[in-house]
A protein has these predicted regions:
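Conserved alpha-helix/loop element of class I SAM-dependent methyltransferases that forms part
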Residues: 7-40
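Class I SAM-dependent methyltransferase SAM/SAH-binding core
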Residues: 40-98
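A short acidic, Gly/Pro-enriched loop at the edge of an enzyme's catalytic core
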Residues: 100-109
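A short glycine-rich, Lys/Arg-flanked "PGG" loop and its adjoining helix->strand segment in the class I
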Residues: 123-138
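Conserved class I S-adenosyl-L-methionine
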Residues: 138-182
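Acceptor-substrate binding/catalytic loop of class I
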Residues: 146-156, 189-205
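Core SAM-dependent methyltransferase catalytic element
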Residues: 213-215, 233-255
């Protein structure tokens, strides 16, 4: 359903990549450049339209592979790579059931920017993504901070959503529509759109799930930058005092 947004943005995404501009944010770039200083095979889990995947080539990746559950998204990603004459592998796969052919293949497994909220079992997620990391390789997560789910996005002053259970809420949010900050605000819902299910995972839950796979936590940092316009009505002077994203880097021990 949301692939239409990526199709409409295809020309702009290709032009940006062609100009050598990575679709990555400041909190990510320094870490990624360091981790990929000697190159490496990179897997991007839940790659959507592939712009971020191909951007990883601009910060040092030797090869990139993207997985997504949507064949339409992968078709958009493949078109971008073809236009740019870039070699990339695209794999149709559910993150909760990544194929064994991806296991232990990658120096870096990259994910985030609205990926974990679609996972209904954080431990199964961790088991799958960590299985794809080579010994001595890294898992890299750049994700929205779970605290952002607490704030009322319709308010003009910082306040907790009145109908939300708080930071530790484990309820699943379900809707047939997409956020207007994710797709065009004027894109009308289509009859028959599937119901989407999201839930938030606390920092503690994410870090624990990764650590329980035997990964060694190297970096956990929090940042004021948004990767999407989550609170358009709230003043930036106030919101910049809070974390809106985080970076988690974990290393798989040598065998």
């Amino acid at each position: 359903e949301a692939s239409g947004q990526y199709t409409r943005e295809l020309d702009a995404a290709v032009a940006k990549l062609e100009a050598g501009i990575a679709n990555l944010m400041e909190p990510e770039i320094g870490h990624l450049t360091r981790l990929l200083s000697s190159g490496g095979d990179v897997l991007h889990v839940q790659c959507a339209g592939g712009t971020d995947t191909l951007s990883l080539l601009l910060v040092g990746a030797s090869t990139v592979t993207g997985t997504d559950i949507s064949p339409n998204m992968l078709a958009v990603a493949e078109e971008k790579a073809a236009r740019l004459n870039l070699d990339a592998e695209w794999v149709l796969a559910d993150t909760a059931r990544l194929p064994e052919t991806l296991h232990n293949r990658f120096e870096l497994v990259y994910t985030g920017r609205g990926a974990l909220n679609w996972m209904m079992d954080i431990n199964i997620w961790a088991q799958n993504v960590c299985a794809c990391v080579r010994p001595c390789g890294h898992l890299f997560i750049f994700e929205g901070h779970p605290l952002d789910w607490v704030w009322d996005e319709t308010a003009r002053a910082l306040q907790i959503q009145p109908d939300y259970g708080g930071y530790f809420d484990t309820n699943v949010a379900s809707d047939t529509e997409w956020p207007t900050s994710y797709i065009d605000a004027d894109m009308e819902p289509v009859a028959g759109w599937s119901k989407k299910h999201e839930r938030q995972w606390t920092l503690g839950e994410v870090v624990t799930a990764v650590a329980q796979q035997g990964m060694i936590i190297e970096v956990l940092s929090e940042h004021p930058e948004y990767y999407w316009d989550a609170h358009p009505l709230l003043p930036w002077d106030e919101m910049k005092k809070l974390p809106h994203t985080y970076v988690l880097i974990a290393r798989k021990p040598a065998e």
